[in-house]
């Protein structure tokens, strides 16, 4: 057999021959060095699977190995032994399809990305033997011919190429184009043809071996379409050719759930319904047809007659607690409402009769199907289904009884909303709270954050087989855990999600201790303080640029919030150095902050900034070395920068990636501090010497960016997690492990000596640091030759003598410069004699290594090489005997324990590095195979065969319109290889025929274009596996490329769905305190839910005192802004407000109201446009943006996404803006230290914006007057008329200042209207009630005895009918029913009755303003978030966009003298126009046929009611002129808005126009009666 070397071609071989020997020698040396680097670390285990369809799973028919892709790696799994082998794709492209050869010796893979290749691998050697690069975008499916001579590959839908490849000759023998999207391919048993299936596509391709062998060039491939008949519009998701007796038949399944059989004439012979919503995959052998369907269902049919045989058991249900599945009964029991993952891929092992299934939650099961009545589970594993964001290694606990997890455990978190606890040595998990489960050998526990089980499914996989992409809205509803951190004592697990919620779980009981909305955006980093610090703090850093410091020892009470950064914070770390506790943080603003902890008061901790460093590149991650002296930071320019923590000076810089492009994403030091691992955006991993910067190892295998990595505590492994949902466990080389363990032993030994000789705690810390530093001989002297940035500024931290900086400079650099170390030459030589030399000296005499190993064993590692006494193999629990049978099919006694036990013989043969002490070939120890069967009971899955009806076609169904000898459009007779038989695709039509099947003409270019357009993403074609970009770099751009921007997927959208004021960050930023260093304990108690989250009891004294000292307006506001997850908060808002209104007993108006910086009157009026009868909110949008708004939005784009700030001033007496614009204390617009430190931002944009906003304030109080008129009451009807005219006058926008009267004693003040700031209210009615304001002192004196009833009446009518009119004019179908209106009126009446205290108007202002505030888009907040969509507040009412340009501004307090006759004329004309429009609309709906649409009746009723309301308002106005001092009582107001006759009788007069109103009502009643009669006649 002529094999082709990996990556070689004729051209490359010719170039090699022509090259000079010296060039070849140099290249050979370089290649050897690179190979050494990649071989230093080997892939030991993969915890993940990336199968996207049935073509991604295959089984070796000889050995039973199951092959599946995991990123850029092919995993070869032996289910019997639970053993993995791996094939790494050297091209770094994602593997999309694979298949075994019939003899099992070779494996063919297809990949995605630019210019993908089809590769053939030797399974035994795991090396590449052949390569074909004839596709452009990606390989959809591959298959070997039964003779292993040919390989067929089909490209992606944009590629549309089918290639038949003689892979041993490296020749493409035949090719053709295919017009449809192809998802599957299958060879016939005799290799004479193969079949492709896809969207409305089943095609038979015929191989003419005689012709292809004679012609050296590629010949056109002959293809003929299957005759689909009625099913031609279906999506065929998978295809399989028959075996033995049914070898002439071909079986397909459709996405709609049909199993179809084609006969040898390509005719659709018969089909059967699978009784499922979706069918994904099919597998055919001699005896059975397996059909993988939705909800974990696998149907089994007889291939001879398509009769139903059985349904296989389902896998685990979604959301199951796998830690409790320790018995077979728990696995095979099913709840009534249980949901299961879909079956997406299957493969069959004919030797063992095992069926392997992959489900779309990334789980793999191997079932024993020897007996369909007794199907057992042989193997199963569960993995993450989405991006894995972070990993944490469970710390080593000295007291094993205190450990919550077994040794060698680690924790991962993912976008699938789960936190998973893994263990690499499952035989050792006894003695902890977690026990062995029967679902996974590696996974111990799944912590599901919420009840949304859909998040557990792979969103990239389109289970329906349709072309619609995954629902991005469903993606955004997921929480997704972004970061995790384990406390040093191993008791608590902290996690932060994408929405900013912080959770803390107790690992012993797995209960949730804390859940608080800490941030406005995703939490990027969590960090517990080290035990050396003497503190138990938790730092939470987020994309909202804030750091919250919580004290874990005090129930996670908030200690401090830091807002120095001006952009996303990517990392935060604690360190204890020189007796000081320090915090270091870095972020996307290119800044590094060093802070020192100080004690404030008795026990509070306060961090103050000591150093601020700015670099020219974004800082993506940071880690502190174990000595706590240096911080290593990974930067966007692919450099690692080392900083001294004490001085803040940069100590060293070196490259952190071998590639020339990309960005460093993560950095991580090992437990000894000798090495540092980095991950780059090119998906590669590298390990460098921490002190010299020399690369010692490289790794690849992930298909997406590596998002996290950690060294294990035993220094044997490096674990990496990635966006491809996989967890890779890498085994480090023996030399690296030995070096790290030797280093740890020396550090511990010197630490013990220092502890014994030290007499003071501070001196202990200093000497321990020096002891760590003194082991510098381990480092290479190459560091002397490298330049060190800012080295001259290095301070003396770590010196054992308190000397000046100049005298100890050399000593502080001892760790970097060996020549200046404190050790003597003799000590250095002794140390060197004990350890192997570092770097580029990997091949050493065996004697040295043996000595090193012995030294290591003598020090601390004897126990790890002790023989393993654990139980070998799977031992069932005591209660399993009656539940399931353990079938041992293994005839080989495994000499090792189960996976990860690493048991070793008693006699250890010390070996050199070249031998296999840490070699990958020493695979996971084999355990006994165990098959778990359900209880012996009647199988419910055995349904009656008659239930699945087999349907067939009449014998002559194709006689009239099909010519079987006609060449197919993809046949060789078609010169351009064009396809024809498939008619253009019709979206959303799956089974209904849309046009006749034509075979008479070739498709025109136009038809091909139409067909191509139909295959776009909007068409029903499954394209989940097609990458968005050639190398799938979209993941990096979304999650790492824009940390300084706010437009990441799931960022602003998720933030907008949260309550604007629910997180700690929001409350912190809304505080108006002038000092940034003010203690923020008050943030814990500003809302009703936060004390419960942070404090153990609601009756905390601080809470009581804080609540009592709060102004009632602030309390009311806090109750208005509650979490959207608690919808009942909004429903209870009225109740809270009434309660607080009962409390007020002070003066008429509080000081808060006197000094309140008001919104413009636009806001006050527009608030009424927002509240509907049932508490819903109708949002209005400003059409024109001011310059300040544009600047504000530009700043939002430069800052982080956050929520809307809408809070009152939390400190009484401090001027602030109600909508948060002028709250200077904490605002995203305020300058931060980072922004001021940059030359490019010499003046903070936040300051400019705040200044402009301040100047733009539309209205300001002088603090002396009465704010009562803001309620909008009408005490005097004469004044009401004037106010109404004034309100109408302000419709005209004037850019100049207008004098406006105030209700204060000064009566007048100046205000500036914003030019072009408009609020259009859609089609107002002629005299719709507007808020009116009093304008003179006389008016105030006249209305002073006014009762609360009169003040509420107009407000009630305003809020109701404004919403109604807006809905009516904008054409909204949602109408407020009279009953709802009445309910709203009742609630407002209750408010009136409650407001019998003198301070009623102050609190009503708060209620009225807070409830109706988010009207102005441009002015609502300084946060980059618009309040257009507040899910959870009002789902029933659609947001109404303004249409009418008539009302461009809301009324202001204009004085009477400012009203001109021209303005009155304009208002009067507008009133007439509005009235005519309303009357015209009324006539149109009443004169039309009422039976045509009942909606017209509703509209007519609404208009009639509105007209009546307008008339009553006019009557009130007339009566008010005659008796201005009259005021209604609360009893009079009851029903006043709805029952005008009561008011008529009450006042004893017949108002003008009642006759016309009654006539109008009578006419409407007659029309309504006619409509009902007509409808009844039609029904009869």
Curated annotation (Swiss-Prot):
Stretches forming WD repeats: 90-131, 134-175, 177-215, 273-311, 338-377, 383-432, 476-515, 518-560, 564-605, 614-653, 659-698, 701-740
PROSITE patterns: WD_REPEATS_2, WD_REPEATS_REGION
Biased composition (Basic and acidic residues): 1543-1555
UniProt keyword annotations, A-Z: Repeat, WD repeat
Composition bias type Low complexity, residue spans: 799-811
Any one of the GO CC terms: mitotic spindle
Polar residues biased stretches: 821-832, 994-1004, 1520-1539
Compositionally skewed regions (Acidic residues) per UniProt: 1005-1016
InterPro entries recorded: MABP1, WD40/YVTN_repeat-like_dom_sf, WD40_MABP1-WDR62_1st, WD40_MABP1-WDR62_2nd, WD40_repeat_dom_sf, WD40_rpt
Domain of life: Eukaryota
Keyword Flavoprotein: no
Entry keyword annotation includes Repeat: yes
Residue ranges, annotated region (Disordered): 749-811, 820-839, 968-1026, 1211-1232, 1369-1397, 1519-1555
GO biological process: negative regulation of canonical NF-kappaB signal transduction; positive regulation of JNK cascade
Stated role: Involved in JNK signaling pathway.
Protein name as it appears in the record: Mitogen-activated protein kinase-binding protein 1
Biological classification of the source: Eukaryota, Metazoa, Chordata, Craniata, Vertebrata
Gene name per UniProt: mapkbp1
